Design a protein with these regions (language model features):
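Loop-to-transmembrane helix boundary motifs in multi-pass membrane proteins
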Residues: 1, 119-123, 231-237, 275-278, ...
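Transmembrane helix-boundary motif of multi-pass solute transporters/channels
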Residues: 1-34, 206, 212, 222-226, ...
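Membrane-interface "cap" regions at the ends of multi-pass membrane proteins
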Residues: 1-15, 44-49, 53-65, 71-72, ...
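Inter-helical loop and helix-membrane interface segments of multi-pass membrane transporters/permeases
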Residues: 19-24, 54-76, 89-140, 169-192, ...
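Membrane-interface alpha-helices at helix entry/exit sites of multi-pass transporters
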Residues: 28-33, 65, 71-76, 109, ...
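Hydrophobic core segments of alpha-helical transmembrane domains in multi-pass membrane transport
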Residues: 33-42, 77-102, 123-137, 152-165, ...
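Central hydrophobic cores of alpha-helical transmembrane segments in multi-pass inner-membrane proteins
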Residues: 37-49, 53, 57-60, 128-137, ...
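Membrane-embedded translocation segments of transport machinery
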Residues: 144, 148-286, 290, 310-311
């Protein structure tokens, strides 16, 4: 349960959900999102988890058991996490760099733009992937053990920052940005809420099927899916309360995405909580990363008959190599574009 919850709780919870909520009607968006979670998110999660438990196999083999022609759906469910992780681990590497900077100098790197333009990012990308590989290497037990430590720590740190943030003078502006109803239900806000449900709960990405294949027959799937969706939504709301009051108090731009975490928020939070914001970011990144890696590892084990050790090593190294262009796309490979996007942005857009 905690491993599946960790897969759903990702970096997007820290900046994407609160920002979408603020830009698409505030409390109105939240209501729309919760309705979609109940009528689509949880049912789809239950279907995927039930399929995984019924077959006990990876996404490709699971869909093949349902119908041979449905195998292609499972193939896309394996390819997507493979590509996403190559991009995700680059950001994970940035986070580790920031955590180490705080641990050694009690400060963030001076220039985020200069840092991501340097080849050094490849090293941190490697370190992050090595951690994900080490956890997946130990199998489901290793993933569950890591999640039991990281998820509670994540919530504790977030609550600490949340309490400090709402006590800032002028914090009400940030809270109004998130929660104040703004307009009615528009097509764009409904579309944003629907897309966020599938993105945030990691639906149709093979993750839920993979974790479902590890569930015992005694596990209550409706209850588990409800708890996962509830934890994911709660963390996203907590993140908004923790981050956006400070963003508005200090006159920052709320729609910066990753740049908000790495470029501007360190200046805001260093006097408040030091590197805690990056500890939170690391916990969300690593739990999602091991879930993404586990999908392709499970595929290699079930479809190709590989041992876990071989699958984790080969797939992990392959993902690392695939992520190198993204890591270098702000510097050495900065002139290379795909449809007018940098390699990093193009992979992220996919």
């Amino acid at each position: 349960l905690l491993a599946a919850a960790g897969s759903a709780i990702g970096l997007g919870n820290l900046w994407k959900f609160p920002y979408l909520m603020g830009r698409n009607g505030g409390f109105t968006f939240l209501i729309t999102y919760l309705v979609f979670v109940l009528i689509l998110g949880v049912p789809v999660m239950m279907l995927e988890m039930s399929l995984g438990r019924y077959t006990g196999r990876d996404p490709v083999q699971s869909y093949k058991i349902v119908h041979p022609k449905a195998k292609i759906v499972g193939v896309f469910g394996v390819i997507a996490p493979f590509i996403i992780l190559s991009y995700y681990s680059v950001i994970g590497g940035w986070i580790i760099k920031y955590i180490i900077s705080y641990a050694t100098t009690f400060d963030a790197p001076a220039d985020f733009t200069a840092f991501i333009a340097s080849p050094e990012t490849v090293i941190w990308h490697l370190v992050f992937m090595a951690l994900a590989i080490a956890i997946c290497y130990k199998g489901v037990a290793g993933i569950e053990k890591a999640s039991k430590i990281m998820l509670p720590a994540l919530f504790v740190l977030l609550i600490i920052i949340m309490i400090r943030s709402v006590t800032l003078e002028g914090a009400s502006v940030g809270l109004k940005f998130i929660f104040e109803p703004k307009g009615g239900f528009t097509l764009s806000s409904i579309n944003a809420a629907l897309g966020q449900v599938f993105y945030s709960l990691s639906l149709c990405m093979g993750i839920t099927i993979t974790y479902g294949s590890y569930l015992s027959k005694k596990e209550n799937i409706p209850k588990s899916c409800g708890l996962i969706a509830g934890m994911d939504t709660m963390l996203a709301i907590f993140a908004g309360i923790a981050i956006f009051p400070a963003v508005f108090v200090f006159g920052l731009e709320p729609g910066q995405g990753p740049g908000l975490i790495f470029g501007t928020l360190p200046k805001v939070f260093e006097a408040m909580t030091g590197g805690s914001i990056f500890a939170i970011a690391f916990f969300t990144a690593i739990t999602s990363a091991i879930a993404l890696l586990e999908v392709v590892v499970s595929f290699a084990i079930d479809s190709w008959g590989w041992s876990r050790k071989k699958a984790v090593a080969v797939m992990g190294i392959t993902v690392f190599c695939l992520g190198i262009p993204s890591a270098l796309s702000f510097g050495v490979l900065g002139d290379i574009t795909i449809l007018n996007y940098s390699v990093f942005d193009f992979i992220g857009m996919i």
